[in-house]
Amino acid sequence: MSLILRIVALPALLLGAVLLYAASKPDIFRVERSQNIEAPPEKIFALINNFHNWPLWAPQDREDATMRRAFSGPESGAGAISEWTSSGSAGGGRMAIIESAPGQKIFVQVDFVKPLAAHNINQFTLQPSGHVTRVTWSMQGTNLFMMKFMSVFVNMDRMAGKHFESGLENLKAAAEK
């Protein structure tokens, strides 16, 4: 085999292997983190169920000073909508509360527009136990090929998980005041 053919074939084989590995990743992804908060579920629920309260705890609101939000629909609960734009790390998109059970759970449809389009469901569940409420924040969505490819090089669970951990710590601080 000539040297030129080897030089061309090796990178092509490596790229093919990476693409094949990426294609074999699961079609659905899920990220989940939990936090114990010393507050009643009703207090925590109010912080999550109303998008106007998210700047008190949501990491993207705290990390990106260029982020701007617009609200529509009811102030809280099912049908509440928050749209955001940013020239920074938060990108742009829309969130809508699609299910809300007082003191128990909230489902939020999250549609990212930029930097990459994606459609996910965030779920917050609240499980009281004595004076402590266990809050679980999870996100599930379709693992598009671009995300599968990125996950070959970047641990997406760790990256999104840090965001959730920060948000839950902020939520804990806000709820325990």
PLM regions with names:
Residues P41, F45-W54, G79, R94, ...:
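Extracytoplasmic/secreted envelope proteins and their assembly/folding machinery
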Residues N49-L56, S87, E99-P102, E169-E176:
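Sec-exported extracytoplasmic/periplasmic mature domains
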